[in-house]
């Protein structure tokens, strides 16, 4: 995708090694992530980005907690091939374990410089951050980029009926 290559080239000129750590994710992979979190096998965060004991929650509350950070299988923007999560590899200390949590992208965080650069530049290349602010659903994800021209087409096609069918036909 040429817009992504150009975004990476311009980031490199600013000393940033913009690297997608997560891109396309099919339904099966998203379901595996979702189910592992639901079963307490993967970390679950509260709305403040702090670890949460998901197994201590009743199913409806657990689902709500998961939806703050993880899309329902079938509804993930990662399914479209237009969205990805990015880090700055140049900013990584040796041995650092990337978490993709807000603290990494906030002032003082390992990827704060990347977040600022993206704030100033991402739209020039046709990208945007679909989870830039808290609108009461998915929590802000400074690391999540979406290619607007392609994602807008996919979003228009994602109707409740399409999502219901995807879930109903899944194992």
What positions do the PLM features span?
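Cell-envelope/glycan interface and biosynthesis
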Residues: 1-171
């Amino acid at each position: 995708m040429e817009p992504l290559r150009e975004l990476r080239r311009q980031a490199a000129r600013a000393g940033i090694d913009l690297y997608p750590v997560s891109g396309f994710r099919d339904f099966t992979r998203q379901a595996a992530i979702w189910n592992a979190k639901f079963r307490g096998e993967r970390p679950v965060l509260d709305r403040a980005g702090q670890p949460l004991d998901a197994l201590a929650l009743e199913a409806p509350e657990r689902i709500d907690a998961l939806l703050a950070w993880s899309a329902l299988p079938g509804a993930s923007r990662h399914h479209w091939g237009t969205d990805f999560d990015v880090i700055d590899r140049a900013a990584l200390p040796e041995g650092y374990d990337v978490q993709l949590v807000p603290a990494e992208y906030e002032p003082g965080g390992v990827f704060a410089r990347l977040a600022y650069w993206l704030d100033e530049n991402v739209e020039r290349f046709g990208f945007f951050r679909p989870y830039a602010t808290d609108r009461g659903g998915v929590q802000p994800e400074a690391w999540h980029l979406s290619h607007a021209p392609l994602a807008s087409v996919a979003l228009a096609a994602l109707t409740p009926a399409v999502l219901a069918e995807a879930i109903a036909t899944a194992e």
